[in-house]
Amino acid sequence: MATEKTMEKIVSLAKSRGFIFPGSEIYGGLANTWDYGPLGVELKNNVKKAWWKKFIQQSPYNVGLDAAILMNPKTWEASGHIGGFSDPLMDCKKCRSRFRADKLIEDYMHSQNEETVVDGWSNQQMKTYIEEKEIVCPECGAKDFTDIRQFNLMFKTFQGVTEDSSTEIFLRPETAQGIFVNFKNVLRTSRKKVPFGIGQIGKSFRNEITPGNFTFRTREFEQMELEFFCKPGEDLEWFNYWKEFCKNWLLNLNLTEENLRIRDHAEEELSHYSKATTDFEYRFPFGWGELWGVADRTDFDLKQHSEHSGEDFTYQDPITNEKYVPYCIEPSVGVDRVALAFLVDAYDEEVIDEKDTRVVLRLHPALAPFKAAVLPLTKKLKDQALELYETLSENYMVDYDEAGSIGKRYRRHDEIGTPFCITFDYDSLEDQCVTIRHRDSMEQERIQISELTTYLNEKLKF
């Protein structure tokens, strides 16, 4: 019988096993900052590798990019971030606590089992709703709020030795704009033709007012974004193609389909640049949370940058000579969020019998921090086991573990998601075979050492 999966259990495992630590912990921490430990950095890197493999490496359409975090501020004027990238804030007049108005409303709706979309509401609509429903301050219970005002989410800093408006720059709030400003550079040097895509993985920063839920919403985060450029009129076809592609990527990495829902935005929810948007939402223990967004951004971004920079982003079809500004389809996913979803989804407490329950992370082998662990049956077999470890570690991330009983070592690796434990015993000296123990089934089989690499290559495929 399965036990309840809670965020407390996930966070406890992540901290105790070296997946994720609180940031700056020895100085009391810094709110909503997290450091990825030895296992966490492997999980996160494996998520990024899996995305890059399917979206870039194996796609005949797409190429990669790594654009700078710091950009000319005119970039953010053109994209609309300086003027319109903000959250609606209000303060409780009694206790001076600060809240996002839309989040207050969403939390209230959740408590009432209502399904209403707040995106796109004006400040006045939100204020009226809060007053009519008599929504109270979550901190003190008062019903006396300030008017709603907009708060820009970009982190501002200065470049150079002086601090004035002429040296003001921003940490990027998204990776997409670095792709748009490099559109012509990539098109020219990669010799691609429309349709084609540019993908990148990188850090972004947003001064969120209500970050939380572990690594789900943080001020510093990593994105995996693809900007796919196509001919106007073919955009909805490509929009549906990338929606299906994203869904298959998640399911092929063993995310449970019943924990995933796909929600198309209503017209009133759409961003000013979007013709169509779909959110992939995952059912976390704290509720449904947005995992991935796929948007039809039309030609908005290229036209904005053309207008503000004077650069012509018109594309000429080499066969028909037709000229147009390409439309753009954007699948955008947060690395931290999707890694958390995989971690939550994989967590299982399996009841073996009345006295025995094992914790196991049923991660897809491609995502597992360690692909295998080499375990000598006794320390007397250490030299031979280490030799095997060194051979395997040339191709895979492998652990070597000789501490404790073999049963305890198995359970330890179940808990961190290692799909295969390889035991080197005394028989191995004679028959040159090892015992492979499978994480999910706990079944064991004997395999020739000479066949191990071929065996693991097949099992670790993605």
From Swiss-Prot:
* Uppermost EC category: ligase
For biological process, the GO terms are: glycyl-tRNA aminoacylation
One Pfam family name from the record?
A: HGTP_anticodon
A single GO molecular-function term is:
ATP binding
Positions annotated to bind ATP: 206-208, 216-221, 290-291, 334-337
What keywords are assigned to this protein? Aminoacyl-tRNA synthetase, ATP-binding, Cytoplasm, Ligase, Nucleotide-binding, Protein biosynthesis
Q: What is its EC number?
A: 6.1.1.14
Q: Is Ligase included in the keywords of this UniProt record?
A: yes
SUPFAM superfamilies in alphabetical order: Class II aaRS ABD-related, Class II aaRS and biotin synthetases
Catalytic activity entry: tRNA(Gly) + glycine + ATP = glycyl-tRNA(Gly) + AMP + diphosphate
Q: Where does substrate bind?
A: R100, E174, F221, E222, Q223, M224, E225, E330, P331, S332, V333, G334
Question: Which cellular compartments is it found in?
Answer: Cytoplasm
What's an example GO cellular component term for this entry?
A: cytoplasm
PROSITE patterns, from UniProt?
AA_TRNA_LIGASE_II (PS50862)
- Has the keyword Aminoacyl-tRNA synthetase been applied to this entry? yes
Q: What is its main location?
A: cytoplasm
What is the protein's known function?
Catalyzes the attachment of glycine to tRNA(Gly).
Subunit info here reads: Homodimer.
Q: Which family does it belong to?
A: Belongs to the class-II aminoacyl-tRNA synthetase family.
Q: Indicate what this protein is called per its UniProt record.
A: Glycine--tRNA ligase
Originating species: Alkaliphilus oremlandii (strain OhILAs) (Clostridium oremlandii (strain OhILAs))
The record's gene field reads glyQS
